[in-house]
């Protein structure tokens, strides 16, 4: 291996530590404390401590190391991962009915992420700042205001991008993980018998001894693996090997040492359960640890915010959310984006959650149901990909699915039992996003079908216009067309009302392919339909933002020269009229109209100069 390659691998692995593992890396702040919370009624006794530690350790091994790093990360689309990517892969070789079911599952998983993303910044930052209780108990009333202040600053700087400060994320998180390891190791050395919990018999004995109560406790243990989806979702940014390398060399050892260090502390001093993480540190280190923990939770929150921006862009490009303003905050990195409406909606939700729940321990009950629900869906989608796309033996796939669900379903069920103590929050938020995504997709499809169902043949119309041409005016006209073989509404209305046509007409169709990126060579396809009509199809991946200036540049290279300031862009603007429907479809129609009115207009989507755009209105019944 060359020196340059080693340096590159080290840099990417370090970057992965800073971004991918922020959420799961801050779980030691609250996980073990919540295992012994009053909800479950466990006393801090050695057999219970060993049981919880064994469960946490084997959860990290089976769910993170085996399920995600070994199996799920094999399913990639040109290197990209994530729940919507997995949904897309799973539906490629299935029947239309099965595909519909898989799409619904994928959208539910994506919706769960939106529910989870509201909780992660709140619980992470609050749990860090709650260290004030240990360092200075008199500051307890300021935990909520301080948490809101920290997160306000984080959301405000989003519009400026995180490129400059982002370089500090990896070193800070590396220091964080090393600190986790050192704090835990210090406590383990003082009480090494805690390492007996590595034996899975303690987890089994825990279930045998405490029976039904231990099942409820799974709802707390699962806090140790929140953020596991980030490993798969961020695969496209860092690659599989650096993410795996970071986990096995730095993250996993640090987490295990810290959890077991907290356990060793509890064996020695059961009173430390009020905050075992911060009580691991000597008195002189409390303030530095509090600052480091706050920085780590802010970085974890930033990773989640960036993740929701990426998921939203993917959903918009795949047609599951309405177009919205997406701002690129870096000229070098296409993945660094900012979506104002998502940013401030998320900020408002996070602040309301902090004010409403007040303590991270209250919020812990809400955390987990979205994570485990997504895990169940991921298992089903992955096994579908293994069976249909990779042609694995169906009995092997069935066995694998059974094993995965034996782990996933009990954890999900245990969290469902927390529905009325906080679990309703991510479910409610997820339900709202699911309704929005399914409404936009289905109503948009119905609208386009209604608009084109009475449309004449494009070829026949062009032949008619060439045979009996209307008055021609100099210049080029571009008509945006959603479908390749359909007459654009704007063209029909221009002929109907103005009775003129430009000397050169370009029918431009934007296509989103089921890949993250499309090579520039394949970006544009040009077809001359007649002496004065051209069809241009521009292809983009769901990680890319369409740009008309780039399309014109590619057209020029292909022999079709178009100058932006000498071209008129004709677009149709639909005024939607709601017809009589059943009450539930009526409400969905109202939601669709509201989403349409607030969607980003096409000229802004494609960065077309406003003074080159002509919009022609049309009324459409839906």
UniProtKB/Swiss-Prot annotation:
Cellular component, GO annotation: plasma membrane
Keyword terms: Cell inner membrane, Cell membrane, Ion transport, Membrane, Potassium, Potassium transport, Symport, Transmembrane, Transmembrane helix, Transport
Chemical reaction(s) catalysed: K(+)(in) + H(+)(in) = K(+)(out) + H(+)(out)
Principal location listed in the UniProt entry: membrane
Record field: transmembrane: 9-29, 46-66, 101-121, 137-157, 165-185, 213-233, 247-267, 276-296, 337-357, 363-383, 395-415, 416-436
Any Pfam family: K_trans_C
Keyword Acetylation among UniProt keywords: no
Compartment annotation: Cell inner membrane
InterPro entries: K+_transporter, K_trans_C, K_trans_N, Kup
Bilayer topology: Multi-pass membrane protein
GO molecular function: potassium ion transmembrane transporter activity; symporter activity
Family: Belongs to the HAK/KUP transporter (TC 2.A.72) family.
Function of the protein: Responsible for the low-affinity transport of potassium into the cell. Likely operates as a K(+):H(+) symporter.
NCBIfam families (alphabetical): kup, PRK10745.1
Protein name: Low affinity potassium transport system protein Kup
UniProt organism field: Yersinia pseudotuberculosis serotype O:1b (strain IP 31758)
Classification lineage: Bacteria, Pseudomonadati, Pseudomonadota, Gammaproteobacteria, Enterobacterales
Encoding gene per record: kup
